[in-house]
Amino acid sequence: MSAPQKPHLNIVIIGHVDHGKSTMTGHILYRLGYFDEKTVKMIEEESKKMGKESFKFAWLLDRMKEERERGVTISLSYMKFETKKYFFTIIDAPGHRDFVKNMITGASQADAAILVVSARKGEFEAGMSAEGQTREHAILARTMGINQLIVAINKMDATEPPYSEKRYNEIKEILGKFLKGLGYDVSKIPFIPISAWTGENLIERSPNMPWYNGPTLVEALDTLEVPPKPINKPLRIPIQDVYNISGIGVVPVGRVETGVLKVGDKLVFMPAGLVAEVKTIETHHTKIEKAEPGDNIGFNVKGVEKKDIKRGDVAGSLDVPPTVADEFTARIMVMWHPTAIAVGYTPVIHVHTASVACRITEIIAKIDPRTGKEIEKNPHFLKQGDIAIVKFKPIKPLVVEKYSDFQGLGRFAMRDMGKTIGIGQVLEIKPAQVNIKK
């Protein structure tokens, strides 16, 4: 018998571009022995030659992911490491503006987030500006239901003077206030002063910051908690990709949100209403008999063809099939808009793995963010900062669920003009009639 496995957690690394997310992740993996010396030497020489030595750890990460894009981490990449207590999968969320929707699909799979902020003068402030991704990513993480947060205050070696306790306290106060406003319990959030480049306070404590007596980053990871698995709810698996594998057949890939999937089960793919039987299930190239919430799986199905299912579909139980919305009512927060939003506005809604344009058919009420009470019925328009109850009509078939029933399928982001316009939670659904083709 193999030793019992450590519990598994998915973690997303978020924060403003160039604040050090990839360097921090690469350095942690390097220190935990995940790279062979040959690769390290090669990358060191390469980065020195190009005069970009400070990219060394980030490049190690890129090499590992085989994506040496022009200094920008694009697709979501999955990496694993273990601590004393847990087995982690890191979802390295890209930091550039136009990748927020990757961040949305990535964040919806995470149990916890590390928010990386730069302590360097001007850089922290840029991340907290109206256009800043520190703000945007924190708001998204909160909406996506990530309740556990670790803040890494990076580049402490580059403050004025270096390792400044005053600067650390200033950032902790500004960011703490902001996170509290989002509904986070700030007393539970560690704010860890680090240098991703020198490795200080990643694994061992830094002698340069004797004023700090909290946990190192890796110690803080071990204080995270495994969220309870919603195994008693009906099965829901948002589909990320579908493959046709020779000798096996059709293999949809996705993460189990709720319920349990077993070999031999019959399930239904919505919105198409197609029924299939599960032949095999795999996770990380290992065959398993059943999959539970949090498992990233590929499962071979009989009874459907690759062309019948696509990213954004949801596989679910036949008894309680996933809901296809004719219309849905949601509470939204407008994060950014240059003018105003009125009835008829049609942003793209990103929910679980789907992205579908949805038209606002009614603005029911404006809400006071502090009390949650209604302050205006049927306002003519909404502007940046407003919270409101609105009705949406999807332009094409879309699976959504009430946030109170299935969190991962009931929270969404609204995108337009390459930006995140707002975020929301589904309150009520008027279901569309779908014939299930048994």
Swiss-Prot record:
| Subcellular location(s) of the protein | Cytoplasm
Q: Region entry G2: which residue ranges?
A: 71-75
- Give all cystine bridges in this chain: none
Provide the primary localization. Answer: cytoplasm
Give any GO molecular function from the UniProt entry: translation elongation factor activity
Write out the ranges of the annotated region (G3).
92-95
Enzyme Commission number: 3.6.5.3
Keywords, alphabetical: Cytoplasm, Elongation factor, GTP-binding, Hydrolase, Magnesium, Metal-binding, Nucleotide-binding, Protein biosynthesis
Span list, region G5: 195-197
- Highest rank taxon of the organism: Archaea
Record: residues binding Mg(2+): 22
| NCBIfam families linked | EF-1_alpha, PRK12317.1, small_GTP
What exactly does this protein do? Answer: GTP hydrolase that promotes the GTP-dependent binding of aminoacyl-tRNA to the A-site of ribosomes during protein biosynthesis.
Q: Would you tell me the protein name for this molecule?
A: Elongation factor 1-alpha
Organism per entry: Desulfurococcus mucosus
What lineage is this protein's organism placed in?
Answer: Archaea, Thermoproteota, Thermoprotei, Desulfurococcales, Desulfurococcaceae
